Amino acid sequence: MEFPDLGAHCSEPSCQRLDFLPLKCDACSGIFCADHVAYAQHHCGSAYQKDIQVPVCPLCNVPVPVARGEPPDRAVGEHIDRDCRSDPAQQKRKIFTNKCERSGCRQREMMKLTCDRCGRNFCIKHRHPLDHECSGEGHQTSRAGLAAISRAQGLASTSTAPSPSRTLPSSSSPSRATPQLPTRTASPVIALQNGLSEDEALQRALELSLAEAKPQVLSSQEEDDLALAQALSASEAEYQQQQAQSRSLKPSNCSLC
């Protein structure tokens, strides 16, 4: 007695057997019998989706877990940068010691990249204030600007210092003493920069630095070029002297009849 509605036929074209306990392929969702349910037996076209391999670190030979869809090379590289226990990886981590302080970033750099606003250290990708959502309030003056301001402050103090000859004698009688008028204090920024803006103060400081700069010492290449030029000029002078001596010692062929 047959039960045509019970079970299912195998999807393999060469089999087509009615199986009362059919099996479903988890890759292609086909129905197969127990003999053809394997990927290789029915030549499954979606078997590559189930071919999951775990990469192994080439330095410490430890399996590295990889998320689905993530390139294995990237996972192995991050493992070498963070968790690898081999000597080359640990030596590399000693060089890259400056960790990015942005939340979620584990990148390390050889040198510090400090934000001018918040003062924290970041990697190359998050060094700009917009990239790491900088919490620093306002715009701080740069180091060059601070140097220019201090230079301008020194110039202002020297230019505004009163000379001894211009000091007025104090009155002898207290009745003639005039009350001092209250002086208005300038804002700290204007007094610090002598009435100049930050850019003007920076330009003034750069001009003074260039004016006070000492003559640069010649490099080794320039010294070699100078010595070669002097040797050539000395050789040329010696050659001309020899030519002049040879002309003076050469006998004349002219004869007077």
UniProtKB/Swiss-Prot annotation:
Disruption phenotype: Knockout mice undergo premature death due to the occurrence of myelo-proliferative neoplasms. The absence of Zfand2b plays a driver role in the development of these neoplasms by hyperactivating the insulin-like growth factor receptor signaling pathway. This is due to increased expression, in particular at the cell surface, of the IGF1R receptor.
Residues bearing PTM Cysteine methyl ester: 254
Consequence of substituting residue 218 to A: No effect on 'Lys-48'-linked polyubiquitin binding
Result, substituting residue 231 to Q: Decreased 'Lys-48'-linked polyubiquitin binding. Loss of interaction with ubiquitin polymers and ubiquitinated proteins, loss of interaction with BAG6 and no effect on association with the proteasome complex
Residues annotated as binding Zn(2+) 1: 10, 15, 33, 36
UniProt subcellular location: Endoplasmic reticulum membrane
Highest taxon in the source lineage: Eukaryota
Proregion positions: 255-257
Effect of residue 163 to A: No effect on association with the proteasome complex
Membrane topology: Lipid-anchor
Lipidation (S-geranylgeranyl cysteine): 254
GO cellular component assignments: endoplasmic reticulum; endoplasmic reticulum membrane; membrane; proteasome complex
Start and end residues, zinc fingers (AN1-type): 4-52, 94-142
Primary role: Plays a role in protein homeostasis by regulating both the translocation and the ubiquitin-mediated proteasomal degradation of nascent proteins at the endoplasmic reticulum. It is involved in the regulation of signal-mediated translocation of proteins into the endoplasmic reticulum. It also plays a role in the ubiquitin-mediated proteasomal degradation of proteins for which signal-mediated translocation to the endoplasmic reticulum has failed.
Name of protein: AN1-type zinc finger protein 2B
Organism: Mus musculus (Mouse)
Biological classification of the source: Eukaryota, Metazoa, Chordata, Craniata, Vertebrata
